[in-house]
Amino acid sequence: MADQLTDDQISEFKEAFSLFDKDGDGCITTKELGTVMRSLGQNPTEAELQDMINEVDADGNGTIDFPEFLNLMARKMKDTDSEEELKEAFRVFDKDQNGFISAAELRHVMTNLGEKLTDEEVDEMIREADVDGDGQINYEEFVKVMMANRRRRRIEESKRSVNSNISRSNNGRKVRKRDRCTIL
């Protein structure tokens, strides 16, 4: 993942990382991560920071080394690219460009994608995403749905990976579900 970064980006990240590596041991504490990221123009929420820390600090020792930090920043930058993709996707759905996706617009795009949905299915999709209850989907609601779907896919991929690793570590023998839970 970090191999997708330019030399300039790596230098910038190294400089920011070094500012917070107080004793020069090549590690920063997880508490300092938020400060480093804000100094690089990122603005993660506390929940996002905790997710990042959980992803990066695999051994739970409370420190993050520079290679782990580079991977984190590369992922974060990829997510920024994804934000642009989300904006473009929203524009595709929002045919009249009024800032909302109506049931008619959703039905039209889904039909063009080859998804023949009933009125009830379209209404259900709108209801699931429509947090403020106005009968249409604004950009924030759209992002929440899309990000929830992305998280769901990542969780499923992680589960498949863990299950695959468990099966391999058990010499191909089937692992009972309750044993799998014990392992996890």
Curated annotation (Swiss-Prot):
<feature type="binding site">
    <location>
        <position position="23"/>
    </location>
    <ligand>
        <name>Ca(2+) 1</name>
    </ligand>
</feature>
<keyword id="KW-0106">Calcium</keyword>
<dbReference type="InterPro" id="IPR050230">
    <property type="entry name" value="CALM/Myosin/TropC-like"/>
</dbReference>
<keyword id="KW-0677">Repeat</keyword>
<feature type="binding site">
    <location>
        <position position="32"/>
    </location>
    <ligand>
        <name>Ca(2+) 1</name>
    </ligand>
</feature>
<feature type="binding site">
    <location>
        <position position="68"/>
    </location>
    <ligand>
        <name>Ca(2+) 2</name>
    </ligand>
</feature>
<feature type="binding site">
    <location>
        <position position="63"/>
    </location>
    <ligand>
        <name>Ca(2+) 2</name>
    </ligand>
</feature>
<feature type="binding site">
    <location>
        <position position="134"/>
    </location>
    <ligand>
        <name>Ca(2+) 4</name>
    </ligand>
</feature>
<dbReference type="GO" id="GO:0016460">
    <property type="term" value="C:myosin II complex"/>
</dbReference>
<feature type="binding site">
    <location>
        <position position="21"/>
    </location>
    <ligand>
        <name>Ca(2+) 1</name>
    </ligand>
</feature>
<comment type="function">
    <text>Calmodulin mediates the control of a large number of enzymes, ion channels and other proteins by Ca(2+). Among the enzymes to be stimulated by the calmodulin-Ca(2+) complex are a number of protein kinases and phosphatases.</text>
</comment>
<keyword id="KW-0488">Methylation</keyword>
<feature type="binding site">
    <location>
        <position position="94"/>
    </location>
    <ligand>
        <name>Ca(2+) 3</name>
    </ligand>
</feature>
<feature type="domain" description="EF-hand 1">
    <location>
        <begin position="8"/>
        <end position="43"/>
    </location>
</feature>
<feature type="binding site">
    <location>
        <position position="25"/>
    </location>
    <ligand>
        <name>Ca(2+) 1</name>
    </ligand>
</feature>
<dbReference type="InterPro" id="IPR018247">
    <property type="entry name" value="EF_Hand_1_Ca_BS"/>
</dbReference>
<feature type="binding site">
    <location>
        <position position="98"/>
    </location>
    <ligand>
        <name>Ca(2+) 3</name>
    </ligand>
</feature>
<dbReference type="GO" id="GO:0005509">
    <property type="term" value="F:calcium ion binding"/>
</dbReference>
<feature type="binding site">
    <location>
        <position position="141"/>
    </location>
    <ligand>
        <name>Ca(2+) 4</name>
    </ligand>
</feature>
<feature type="binding site">
    <location>
        <position position="136"/>
    </location>
    <ligand>
        <name>Ca(2+) 4</name>
    </ligand>
</feature>
<feature type="domain" description="EF-hand 4">
    <location>
        <begin position="117"/>
        <end position="152"/>
    </location>
</feature>
<comment type="similarity">
    <text>Belongs to the calmodulin family.</text>
</comment>
<feature type="domain" description="EF-hand 3">
    <location>
        <begin position="81"/>
        <end position="116"/>
    </location>
</feature>
<dbReference type="Pfam" id="PF13499">
    <property type="entry name" value="EF-hand_7"/>
</dbReference>
<feature type="binding site">
    <location>
        <position position="130"/>
    </location>
    <ligand>
        <name>Ca(2+) 4</name>
    </ligand>
</feature>
<keyword id="KW-0479">Metal-binding</keyword>
<feature type="modified residue" description="N6,N6,N6-trimethyllysine">
    <location>
        <position position="116"/>
    </location>
</feature>
<feature type="binding site">
    <location>
        <position position="61"/>
    </location>
    <ligand>
        <name>Ca(2+) 2</name>
    </ligand>
</feature>
<dbReference type="InterPro" id="IPR002048">
    <property type="entry name" value="EF_hand_dom"/>
</dbReference>
<feature type="region of interest" description="Disordered">
    <location>
        <begin position="156"/>
        <end position="184"/>
    </location>
</feature>
<protein>
    <recommendedName>
        <fullName>Calmodulin-related protein</fullName>
    </recommendedName>
</protein>
<feature type="binding site">
    <location>
        <position position="132"/>
    </location>
    <ligand>
        <name>Ca(2+) 4</name>
    </ligand>
</feature>
<feature type="binding site">
    <location>
        <position position="59"/>
    </location>
    <ligand>
        <name>Ca(2+) 2</name>
    </ligand>
</feature>
<dbReference type="InterPro" id="IPR011992">
    <property type="entry name" value="EF-hand-dom_pair"/>
</dbReference>
<feature type="compositionally biased region" description="Basic residues">
    <location>
        <begin position="171"/>
        <end position="184"/>
    </location>
</feature>
<feature type="binding site">
    <location>
        <position position="96"/>
    </location>
    <ligand>
        <name>Ca(2+) 3</name>
    </ligand>
</feature>
<feature type="domain" description="EF-hand 2">
    <location>
        <begin position="44"/>
        <end position="79"/>
    </location>
</feature>
<feature type="binding site">
    <location>
        <position position="57"/>
    </location>
    <ligand>
        <name>Ca(2+) 2</name>
    </ligand>
</feature>
<feature type="binding site">
    <location>
        <position position="105"/>
    </location>
    <ligand>
        <name>Ca(2+) 3</name>
    </ligand>
</feature>
<feature type="compositionally biased region" description="Low complexity">
    <location>
        <begin position="161"/>
        <end position="170"/>
    </location>
</feature>
<feature type="binding site">
    <location>
        <position position="27"/>
    </location>
    <ligand>
        <name>Ca(2+) 1</name>
    </ligand>
</feature>
